[in-house]
Every structure is written in C-alpha cells, then in structure tokens.
C-alpha cells in the first residue's frame, strides 16, 4: 500500500461512511485561505436574510471585502473562536457553524445538519509554490480545520517523515499553516499518529495521538487492519469532530514575561484526554447519580485540562430537559487551577461567568445561590466550608472532582462533605440514634453525588474508595482505576521525561571522635541515628554539599547549555532550617565564583533562624506569590525547597534536582516527577541524590509505572480486633460509652464529657503497665484513624462502631503521651565532628520493569511494643559508626591529609592542566587533571605509600580526590 493508498482509504471512508463532501484543490482560495464557495453556500442556506441585508456576496467588491475581513478575523482570533462566536459584518452577526443540539429541537437539528463537512486531497495551498500539495485537509463550512500528512511503512516512510515534512516544508508564513488558522495538524502513518496545534518550523512540537497498548506507547495490533484507522472511523466522524470543536479545542491567552500582549495558544485534546472525558460523560449519562470514578493519569499528562473539560461538560449534561448535575465542585491543592479553569471555560461560547472561587462559607453560599455552575475550592478551606453551610443541599445533584485524590480525601473530611451535599444535616428534633445513623450515612458516599478522583499515584485508600470493584477468582474483591494513562505510556510517547534515566547517588563518609575521657554506654541503634543527624547538620557538611551542587549546576547544567541555556534546578531539603542553610551556602558559593545566577528559598510559615523569625519573603526580598514567576527569569536559577513545590508544580524549565531528603513511596514519585515536564529544548534530566538508596527510589516508581490495582478490600472485622485489645485493658465500661454518647449528641457541656473521659484516663494511668499502655493507646489511635475510611466504603452500618469512634477520639486526646525512653541522653555532648567527605557514585539508569503493580489494602494494626535498648560503650559505638560511614581508616592520617592539601598547588604547576583549563571545556580539563594527578601521586609514593596505594586501588576514593582537587586547582590558575 502506498502513501496515496492510505490517503484514498481515509478520504473514501470519510465520504462513504461519515457523509463528507469531496472537495477539490481548485475550490480553495489561497488569498483568503478558505473555500469561498462552501462558505457562501452555508451562509445562504442558513441566514438568507442577513445575506440580503448586508449584500455580503455581491457586488464583487463587497464580496471581496467580506472574505478579506473574515480571513483577517480568523488570523487574529483563531478558527475555533470564530466558529464558536461568529463574525460581524455591516452590523450583523453571521453564524459560521451550528453546534450539536442539546435537546430534540427540530429547528436546531436542521441547522446542525446544514453544516458542510468536506475533505480535500492533494490541496495546492501555496501561492508561491503552486506545485506543493498537502495530502489531506478537512473543512467545515468551507473553513480549513485540520491538515494531515500521511506516510506508509511499506514505502519506507513513517510518521517521523511526516513530522519532518511539516517542520521543513510547511512554514508558518504560509497562511494555511499560520498560528490558529487550523485547529490541529496531524502526522499519520499506518501505525502511529502525532499532532501539533501550532507549527513553528524546526521547533514544531508534535505530541502523540495514540490509543496506547499494554500500558505503553503505540496502538493495539489488529490483524489485516490499519492501526490508525480510528482517526477517520472514530475521531473525525461529524458528531465527534463537532464535539471536539465545541467542547475541547480552544485558543487560550497566557501572559509571558517581556511580551506586551498575552500569547495565544491553541489547545487540542490528546487521545487519552478525549477518551477519558467521553467515557466519564457516557457513564454519568447512562447511570443514576451516586457513581465513583478513579482516573490514574501520569504526572504531567495534562490533568488540569482534562479536569477543565470534564467540569465544563458535566454542567451541560441534560436528561429530559433537566441538568444531571446542578453544580460541579472541584477540590484541589493548586490555587492556580482556579485561574486555569476560568480562562479555559471563557474560551467557550455557550456558558459565560459560571466559575466561582470559594474560600469561605459566605463565598460558597453566594456561588450556589448565584447559579455558579463550577465552584473551585482548596482542600484547606473545604473543611471550614462544610462545617458552616449546613445541610440544605440534599435536593440538588453534585459532581465532585478531586484533584490528586490521595491528598484530598480523609475519612472525617469525606464524612462532612457527604453530610453537606446529601442534606444529612443535624435536626434538633431527631433522637440520638437517628442522628447517629445520619452521621454514619454521611460517612458513606452521598447518593446525590458523583465523584471523579484524579491522581497519578493512587494509594490503597484511594483505590478502595474510588476504584472500580472487580471480582477475583478467589472470591476477593479488588479495585482498579476506571481510566488509565500510565507513566510508562507517557514516557514512551515522549510526553514526559524519564527522570530516572540519569540518576547519580552520592555517599557520605563521616568520622566522629570522643570528646570526653569517660566511656558511658548508650543504645547503639538510637545513637547511630542521632550521630548521623549530628554530622548532617554540621556547617562543613552543608558547605561540601553546596559546593557539589553549585559546581555541578554551573558545569554540567549551565555549561552544557541544558534546555537551550534556560535550565533551572531544585534543591530538596529535609527541613526549613536545612533549606535556609543550603540557601545561604549556595548563595555564598555563587557569589565567590562570581556567577550571575541566584537562588530562591521556599518554605511555608515562619521559622526562627539565628535568633530572628524569618519567612521566605524576608529572605528572598520579594513576596511569596512571586516565587513561581521569579524562578522563570534570570538571575534566578536554583530553587531551594522545604516541603514546598514538591507536588503539583509544573515548570518545564526544571532540569536538575539535588535531593538531600529521604523520600519513599508516593513522596518519592511526586517529588522527582517535578522534573518530568517536557520542553522543546529539553533533551534529558538529572538527579543528584545525597540521601536515598537508588533501589528504594526504583521500587517507589515501579508501583506507579503501569497500572496500579488494589489486591483486595479491607476487612472491616479488623476493627473488632482493635476493640478487643482496648476492651481487654478494662479502662472503660459499656455504660461509660453509652453515657458519653448521650451527652455528646445532646451538646452537653464539655466538663460533663471530661468527667467520663477522666475516669477512664485514671484507670489507664493507675492500672496498666507501661507495655499495656502502649498496646491500648496504639489500638485506640489505629481505630480512630481507620474507622472513618472503612465507614465510607463498607456495605453495612454499625451504630456501635460509630459510638466507639467518638468515644475513642476524645479518650485518645486525653491519654498521656507515652515517653519513649531516650537511651542517648548526653551523647551529642560527648562527641565531636572530625572528618566529612562525600563521594560521587556511578551514574545509573534506574530502569523499570514492564509490569502492573498490586498493592494491599490499609493495614488495620497496632504499633510495636516497647523495644529493649541495646547498650554499648561510646567508644565501641563510635568505632562501629566510623567503620560504617567513615570509608577508609588511615594509619597515618596527618601525613595523608598533608599530602592531599599539597595536590592543588602541585597540579597548578602543570602546563598541560593550565592549558586545558584556559582553552578547553570543563570535561576535557577534568580528564587532564586526572592524568596529571595520577603522575603526581606516583611521585609522592617515596614519602608515604598509604595515600598512593588507596588512590591507585580505590576507584571511589580516586574519583573523590580528582573531583575535589580539580575544583581547588582550577580556582587558582
């Protein structure tokens, strides 16, 4: 099959099965970049009175004026906006397209059917190069909407050749390929489809428009079928294309630094976004309200746009002339999602001013009463809103869209949300039992709400609460996402970067010494952890790591012109104090190296530092709200963070991450995934990790690389196990629980509740051993943590469990804090910091296996009991610590130290090294350094063989010395 053969199949299908007209290249007017004959035919067919009043198609001068103004309007506003909003000429508004009717209105159906869909092969589009022809162009009412270049494997050409053709031979100076003139450009072969919404020559960025196969890139294999035929058989049907133009495609405006006017960008949905929203809308329309959907879409996959399109279309869904949902509530941690949704929806014509931002109860009430259809709120404000507005909404239907569901749903908050939207609010005339039953029902998913939970990293609670139930052969019920766009597919399609491809761990080596004559004993396990923390917070440690960070960033990132010279870096620290220390150390290093670049520190709240209370704004010298914009422009290049910007932060310029914080599971994936956003000039990423084992990072990513499912549901009877543990302690009676709940549900004074709780606390203190106290309190805490979640998902209700929940909750807050014996008291005062060094390990590609992950449900267990200390003498603890973390133990340490200190000066005398520094790049100079140092060390063997032997035999040590001496010697030549 030739390229023309694929073209024939596509065009013939559109004509014979989708009702397209066959256009001719001669129909196309190159001056106006449209098909004037079909434009005129459509307008005369639908608006003859306006044609007569304006005389827009005659005389000829008027006709030319009409088409010239129309063409200019499309060039300025974009074809999608002009089709939606129409075109004014001589005081009248001309409709250029009629949307899909939302109800059975014969007139609306008739006008929609008058839209003219046409397809033209071999379109000679260029006035300058009249022989050049585009393979396929799709028109609606005479306006070009879609272009396509087709290739075929059988002729030795693929989608890559089609992309190259667009980049080389389809310049934006040609009106047909100018920005916003067409909605999208497709590069197609018989196996893959790529799309580009704005051509920019060599910088044209094509994204995949494939279905995906087995959780990865590509399209499902179909014997004797063209793998890409879904484009013309499914996507380009009249109703489907009309739906995309009306509800997805848009031109949005975004302000960019240094540009006087907002930059207009064309948005076209990718296949997984289109597929996801359409399937969700179908299920919403086909089933009664009260459904739950979990959408597992990879970080960086465009969840914000998917949420926007879903929210907008949910409020327009109609059944029997009534809205299926009255309002959509979007719960998010990202404040900027409000502006994004508002801007996106403003691009649509049919609904205007429908989005509200609710940050307190008053604004939420105002939004609901004012008919706002989409209400956005953050998780931090949602609790207050739900507690305040009462339960008068039970007669309304809601859709609740949860952005990053794992962080936005806990049992107690879910219960309050369900109570409010279901109308299960407090009623003073109810008896206690009735009210408890309503609270339990409120914990369950409200019957008048559909939940749409989006996340890239679903936890077990999220899967069980929102996932689709599936029956396993063993009778257990698991849960799976309703829709998936996996990390694997996103990486393979080139939509996000593989952040684990260039991962370099660093290993720290420390040595500490005893600072007292005595040799006391401490718990060796507690001591080792405490000593490592002591070393890690030493100024020398921060200085060494900061030097590595700055040198690497300047040499390997800035020096290598990463992201076209625009690369940014993030330093992830373990605490606010550590972030501040790193910020000042990095700032000092940059200044000493006379670098033009600066760092920014980011943390929440205020913190005492050097005797003063400081905030990020005080340290940075500008408001916190400006951090995201500041880091995008020079001189700011390095962002130092403490538990901030580690989730939901979308910055394509971010190229390198320096990690000095232990990360695990979801936190590891979320944090490192900040690097995965693509940029046309971003070819790779880099992670330099001071704190984590590469295998732990690899294991965390593997869980969310492909599909993630829940193995089986949580067994509610595990709660009975916890209750039995608490009851065995005999610190309360059944009468205590009943009396407490009676008082609690009748809003009795706090002192009446305390009288009951205090009796139980007294028994806890007086009658239980320390081991029993630990076991009892752990069971109470586990019950309080687990019950709200289980109550939301279990198929039955238990008033007794609900009563115990409230009783345990208050009891748990009053129980004394159990002291964890500190068997290291006085340790820090007994030691001193002696040596610290940090060594680069081998760079690795943390590849992931092609397999789905299955995770277990929420564990319903208590913590471990009291552990016995393992006492050892301080000298032995120090010996073991230095052996574990100290690397080489030197016999003649002072001599070795003196030899190492000589090396920079000796190296600086080498002409070959000096020439390399002044005339070569950093990598070449480092290689010359390594060569010259090798000879210098050989020459030093006569003095002391210990240093030379370790340098020659220990590659890790040799690399450390080479790197450090290179930096020091370069600074003096």
Question: Model-found features: residue ranges?
Answer:
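Post-DEXD/H (motif II) to motif III coupling segment of the RecA-like Helicase ATP-binding lobe
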Residues: 410-499
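Conserved RecA-like ASCE ATPase "motif II neighborhood" in helicase/translocase motors
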Residues: 372-404, 408-419, 426-427, 432-441, ...
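Catalytic cores and motor modules of nucleic-acid processing enzymes
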Residues: 21, 35, 41-47, 51, ...
């Amino acid at each position: 099959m030739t390229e023309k053969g694929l073209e024939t199949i596509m065009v013939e299908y559109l004509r014979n099965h989708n009702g397209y007209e066959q256009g001719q290249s001669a129909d196309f007017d190159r001056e106006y970049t449209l098909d004037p004959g079909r434009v005129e035919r459509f307008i005369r067919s639908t608006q003859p009175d306006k044609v007569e009043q304006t005389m827009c198609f005659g005389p000829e001068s008027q006709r030319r004026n009409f088409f010239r103004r129309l063409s200019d309007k499309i060039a300025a506003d974009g074809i999608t906006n002009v089709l939606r909003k129409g075109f004014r000429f001589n005081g009248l508004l001309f409709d250029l397209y009629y949307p899909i009717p939302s109800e059975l209105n014969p007139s609306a159906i008739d006008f929609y059917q008058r839209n003219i869909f046409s397809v033209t092969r071999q379109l000679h589009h260029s006035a300058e190069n009249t022989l050049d022809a585009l393979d396929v162009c799709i028109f609606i009412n005479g306006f070009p909407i879609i272009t396509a270049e087709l290739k075929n494997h059988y002729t030795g050409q693929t989608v890559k050749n089609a992309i190259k053709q667009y980049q080389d031979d389809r310049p934006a100076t040609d009106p047909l390929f100018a920005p916003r003139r067409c909605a999208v450009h497709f590069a197609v072969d018989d196996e893959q489809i790529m799309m580009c919404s704005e051509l920019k020559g060599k910088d044209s960025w094509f994204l995949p428009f494939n279905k995906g196969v087995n959780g990865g890139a590509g399209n499902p294999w179909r014997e004797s079928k063209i793998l890409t035929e879904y484009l013309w058989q499914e996507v380009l049907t009249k109703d489907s294309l009309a739906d995309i133009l009306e509800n997805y495609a848009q031109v949005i405006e975004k302000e960019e630094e240094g540009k006087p006017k907002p930059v207009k960008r064309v948005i076209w949905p990718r296949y997984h976004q289109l597929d996801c929203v359409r399937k969700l809308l179908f299920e919403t329309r086909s089933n009664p309200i009260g459904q739950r959907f979990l959408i597992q879409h990879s970080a960086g996959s465009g969840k914000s746009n998917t949420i926007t399109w879903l929210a907008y279309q949910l409020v327009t869904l109609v059944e029997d002339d009534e809205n299926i949902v009255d309002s959509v509530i979007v719960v998010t941690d990202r404040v900027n999602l409000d502006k994004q949704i508002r801007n996106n929806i403003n691009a649509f014509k049919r609904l205007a001013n429908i989005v509200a931002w609710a940050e307190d109860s008053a604004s939420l009430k105002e939004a609901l009463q004012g008919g706002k259809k989409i209400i956005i709120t953050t998780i931090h404000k949602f609790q207050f809103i739900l507690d305040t507005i009462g339960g008068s909404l039970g007669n309304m239907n809601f859709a609740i869209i949860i952005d990053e569901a794992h962080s936005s749903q806990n049992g107690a908050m879910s219960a309050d949300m369900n109570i409010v939207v279901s109308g299960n609010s407090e009623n003073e005339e109810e008896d206690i039992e009735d009210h408890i039953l309503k609270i339990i029902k409120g914990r369950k998913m409200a019957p008048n709400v559909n939940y749409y939970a989006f996340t890239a990293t679903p936890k077990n609670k999220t899967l069980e609460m929102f996932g689709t139930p599936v029956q396993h052969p063993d009778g257990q019920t698991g849960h799976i996402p309703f829709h998936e766009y996996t990390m694997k597919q996103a990486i393979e399609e080139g939509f996000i970067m593989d952040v684990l491809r260039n991962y370099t761990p660093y290993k720290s080596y420390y040595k500490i010494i005893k600072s007292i004559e005595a040799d006391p004993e401490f718990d060796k396990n507690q001591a080792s952890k405490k000593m490592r923390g002591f070393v890690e917070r030493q100024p020398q440690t921060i200085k060494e790591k900061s030097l590595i960070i700055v040198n690497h960033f300047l040499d390997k990132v800035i020096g290598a012109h990463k992201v076209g010279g625009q690369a940014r870096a993030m330093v992830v620290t373990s605490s606010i104090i550590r972030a501040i220390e790193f910020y000042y150390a990095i700032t000092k290093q940059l200044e000493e190296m006379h670098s033009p670049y600066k760092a920014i520190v980011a943390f929440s709240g205020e913190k005492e530092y050097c005797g003063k209370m400081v905030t990020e704004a005080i340290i940075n010298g500008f408001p916190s709200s400006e951090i995201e914009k500041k880091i995008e422009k020079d001189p700011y290049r390095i962002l130092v963070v403490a538990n901030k910007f580690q989730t939901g932060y979308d910055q394509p310029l971010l190229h390198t991450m320096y990690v000095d914080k232990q990360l695990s599971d979801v936190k590891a994936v979320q944090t490192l995934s900040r690097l995965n956003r693509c940029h046309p000039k971003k070819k790779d990423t880099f992670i330099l990790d001071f704190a984590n084992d590469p295998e732990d990072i690899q294991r965390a990513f593997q869980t969310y690389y492909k599909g993630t499912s829940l193995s089986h549901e949580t067994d509610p009877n595990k709660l009975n196990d916890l209750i039995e543990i608490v009851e065995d302690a005999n610190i309360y009676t059944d009468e205590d629980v009943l009396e407490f709940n009676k008082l609690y549900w009748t809003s009795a004074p706090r002192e009446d509740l305390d009288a009951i709780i205090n009796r139980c606390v007294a028994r806890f203190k007086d009658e239980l051993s320390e081991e029993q106290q630990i076991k009892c309190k752990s069971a109470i805490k586990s019950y309080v943590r687990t019950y709200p979640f289980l109550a939301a998902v279990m198929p039955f209700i238990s008033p007794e469990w609900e009563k115990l929940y409230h009783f345990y909750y208050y009891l748990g807050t009053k129980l004394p804090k159990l002291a964890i014996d500190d068997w290291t008291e006085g340790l820090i005062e007994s030691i001193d910091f002696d040596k610290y060094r940090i060594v680069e390990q081998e760079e690795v590609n943390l590849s992931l296996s092609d397999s789905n992950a299955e995770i277990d449900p929420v564990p319903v267990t208590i913590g471990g009991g009291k552990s016995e200390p393992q006492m050892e003498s301080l000298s032995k603890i120090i010996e073991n610590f230095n052996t574990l973390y100290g690397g080489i133990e030197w016999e003649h340490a002072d001599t070795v130290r003196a030899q190492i200190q000589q090396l920079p000066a000796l190296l600086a005398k080498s002409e070959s090294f000096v020439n390399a520094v002044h005339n070569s790049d950093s990598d070449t100079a480092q290689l010359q350094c390594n060569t010259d140092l090798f000879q210098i060390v050989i020459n030093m063997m006569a003095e002391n063989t210990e240093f030379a032997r370790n340098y020659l035999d220990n590659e890790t040590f040799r690399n450390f010395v080479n790197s450090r001496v290179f930096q020091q010697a370069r600074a003096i030549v």
